[in-house]
């Protein structure tokens, strides 16, 4: 029997597969928000797609999602 690839559990929690690629959360939004402007905090809301150049790395880390 062949070996199975392991999923990086930390990456599996951070990325979700969609039809257009992988969804990810914006960085720099979890703490030390007092020095960041409301405009900057507002723009960090929501989900973004992983860049095309990083998709292969995410796919290797999460082969089954």
Curated annotation (Swiss-Prot):
This protein's GO CC annotations:
cytosolic large ribosomal subunit
> Keyword set for this entry?
Ribonucleoprotein, Ribosomal protein
Q: Which cysteines are joined by disulfide bonds?
A: none
InterPro entries (alphabetical): Ribosomal_bL35, Ribosomal_bL35-like, Ribosomal_bL35_CS, Ribosomal_bL35_sf
Cited PROSITE patterns: RIBOSOMAL_L35 (PS00936)
Family, as annotated: Belongs to the bacterial ribosomal protein bL35 family.
The biological processes this protein is annotated with in GO are: translation
Ribonucleoprotein as a keyword of this entry, yes or no, is yes
Q: Does the entry feature the keyword Ribosomal protein, yes or no?
A: yes
Record-level Gene Ontology MF annotations: structural constituent of ribosome
- Report what the protein is called: Large ribosomal subunit protein bL35
């Amino acid at each position: 029997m062949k070996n199975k690839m392991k999923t990086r559990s930390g990456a599996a929690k951070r990325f979700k597969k969609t039809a257009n690629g992988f969804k990810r959360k914006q960085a720099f939004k979890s703490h030390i928000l007092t020095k960041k402007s409301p405009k900057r905090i507002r723009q960090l809301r929501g989900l973004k797609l992983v860049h095309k150049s990083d998709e292969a790395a995410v796919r290797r880390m999460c082969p089954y999602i």
